[in-house]
Amino acid sequence: MISPIKNIKNVFPINTANTEYIVRNIYPRVEHGYFNESPNIYDKKYISGITRSMAQLKIEEFINEKSRRLNYMKTMYSPCPEDFQPISRDEASIPEGSWLTVISGKRPMGQFSVDSLYHPDLHALCELPEISCKIFPKENSDFLYIIVVFRNDSPQGELRANRFIELYDIKREIMQVLRDESPELKSIKSEIIIAREMGELFSYASEEIDSYIKQMNDRFSQIKARMSVT
């Protein structure tokens, strides 16, 4: 079972070069051993040092970039509306689109991934008013982290974030049950089961959810047909 961590409601601007503190500030339960490890190739874009605990933040790549991104996010930020309208999947198909649709008030919750806990966008997001993130490591990956970003000023925000995490766990459990199937079949079968509710959580238009499920079912049929002739 995933145990994600939500950042505190108001993360204050960080005026420190301590590379351990800035991560614990947004992800308190990160394992202590994480900081005894050498920065990986993705961390090295933002910090430099023998270990993460002894590393220094890079001025241009982290400090200045986080400041630029935070300023941009503030210009795009909008208070939460009373009602949300469906969005297109295309609006959230890349990480920036995923969090931008949340902070601009288009939807209460989104999800994206980062390749480093020192990613400037993640730290900038955590300083915005009424924005929170739940963070957990992606399974079968040594460096990716799932970020669930949501609105605190919407009752739907954290409810949807928690349900997303439940569905994420359900998909993992389904894939474990189907462990004797091919990786492709496991992925498609588990996706079909959760796709509709997941799409609704992400505020996708119903016709796009229908189209995506049809696409998954068509792929499933093609694979089964291919297997039947081999």
From Swiss-Prot:
Its EC number is 2.1.1.-. One of its GO terms (biological process) is methylation. S-adenosyl-L-methionine binds at A92, S98, R107, Q111, Y204, E208. InterPro entries: NleE/OspZ (IPR048901). GO terms for molecular function: protein-cysteine methyltransferase activity; toxin activity. Keywords: Host cytoplasm, Host nucleus, Methyltransferase, S-adenosyl-L-methionine, Secreted, Toxin, Transferase, Virulence. Coiled coil: none annotated. Residues 49-52 are annotated as: Interaction with host proteins TAB2, TAB3 and ZRANB3. It catalyses: L-cysteinyl-[protein] + S-adenosyl-L-methionine = S-methyl-L-cysteinyl-[protein] + S-adenosyl-L-homocysteine + H(+). It is found in: Secreted; Host cytoplasm; Host nucleus. Its main location: secreted. One of its GO terms (cellular component) is host cell nucleus. Monomer. Belongs to the NleE/OspZ family. Cysteine methyltransferase effector that inhibits host cell NF-kappa-B activation by preventing nuclear translocation of host protein RELA/p65. Acts by mediating cysteine methylation of host proteins TAB2 and TAB3: methylation of a conserved cysteine residue of the RanBP2-type zinc finger (NZF) of TAB2 and TAB3 disrupts zinc-binding, thereby inactivating the ubiquitin chain-binding activity of TAB2 and TAB3, leading to NF-kappa-B inactivation. Also mediates cysteine methylation of host protein ZRANB3, inactivating its ability to bind ubiquitin chains. This is Cysteine S-methyltransferase OspZ. It comes from Shigella flexneri. The gene is ospZ.
